């Protein structure tokens, strides 16, 4: 299985598993490090999609999937280095 397919399957499975939890979380329950992580994500997604018309159309979906994935990873680790490694792995 190639890396792209592996990443896609990971994100799809994660999205299904975490979507309801994500929507139940209240804004104030996401702590400061998770909010910082979301800012990093927004910046990464912007950099990755700014020159690509195809990705521009998918930016919102990509942002939702990456945010879900990274919040899920981060809430279980609370280790920023591990989380940044995971972001690199799931980023296009």
Curated annotation (Swiss-Prot):
Subcellular location: Host cytoplasm; Host mitochondrion
Listed Pfam families: Rota_NS6
The organism's place on the tree of life at top rank: Viruses
Cellular component terms per the entry's GO annotation: host cell mitochondrion
Alphabetic keyword roster: Host cytoplasm, Host mitochondrion
InterPro entries documented for this protein: Rotavirus_NSP6 (IPR006950)
HAMAP family in alphabetical order: ROTA_NSP6
Record's subunit section: Interacts with NSP2 and NSP5.
Family: Belongs to the rotavirus A NSP6 family.
Protein's name in the database: Non-structural protein 6
Source species: Rotavirus A (strain RVA/Pig/Mexico/YM/1983/G11P9[7]) (RV-A)
């Amino acid at each position: 299985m190639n890396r792209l397919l592996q990443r896609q399957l990971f994100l799809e499975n994660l999205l299904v598993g975490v979507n309801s939890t994500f929507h139940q979380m209240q804004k104030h329950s996401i702590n400061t490090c998770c909010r910082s992580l979301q800012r990093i994500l927004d910046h990464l997604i912007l950099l990755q999609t700014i020159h690509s018309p195809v990705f521009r159309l998918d930016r919102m979906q990509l942002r939702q999937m990456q945010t879900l994935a990274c919040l899920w990873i981060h809430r279980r680790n609370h280790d920023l280095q591990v989380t940044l490694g995971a972001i690199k792995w799931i980023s296009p």
